[in-house]
Regions:
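N-terminal presequences and immediately downstream first alpha-helices
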Residues: 1-32
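Short strand->helix junction
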Residues: 71-73
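Short beta-strand element of the alpha/beta-hydrolase
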Residues: 61-69
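Hydrophobic/aromatic beta-strand patches that form the interior of the parallel beta-sheet core
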Residues: 42, 65, 94-96
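Active-site-proximal cofactor/substrate-binding loop regions of enzyme domains
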Residues: 64, 93, 118, 122
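Catalytic nucleophile-loop/oxyanion-hole region of alpha/beta-hydrolase
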Residues: 99-124
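Conserved alpha/beta-hydrolase
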Residues: 75, 83-107
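N-terminal cap/lid segment of alpha/beta-hydrolase-fold proteins
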Residues: 21-58
Length: 124
């Protein structure tokens, strides 16, 4: 693992067979499988008397917050793969499930979108 002192940011280099960003997304969705992650779930109550769930892997190192995409959840392939790596590193990971994305319908008509960050702000 690199420390902050010797960390260097490098440019992303696409694989030769996935030059198009759309093909990268499609490939991941079809060919990559999710990992099995043992989460601990916490429910956070929001100021508007609704809720969202956060699935957690406990560790001792840095904390990573993972945000799923549209109609995703903490069980999305990219999230479970990330959380598996976080777990192996001994870090803590918080996978937020935006409203109505944890398998339970919420109490209010409010749903999430990328422009609404109040739930993420509450988690942080």
């Amino acid at each position: 693992m690199k420390s902050k002192a010797n960390f260097q940011l490098t440019s992303f280099r696409t694989p030769y067979h996935l030059r198009n960003p759309h093909s990268q997304s499609i490939y991941a969705g079809i060919f990559l499988k999710g990992e099995s992650v043992k989460y601990r779930r916490e429910r956070l109550v929001t100021p508007d008397e609704d809720f969202f769930d956060v699935d957690i892997v406990d560790g001792r190192g840095p904390v990573v917050i993972a945000c799923h995409g549209f109609e995703g959840s903490s069980n999305s392939t990219h999230i479970t793969r990330l959380m598996t790596l976080i777990q192996k590193l001994g870090w803590s990971g918080y996978a937020i499930n935006y409203r109505s994305c944890s398998g339970e319908i919420n109490n209010t008509f409010y749903t999430y979108n990328a422009g609404k960050t109040e739930d993420l702000e509450q988690l942080i």
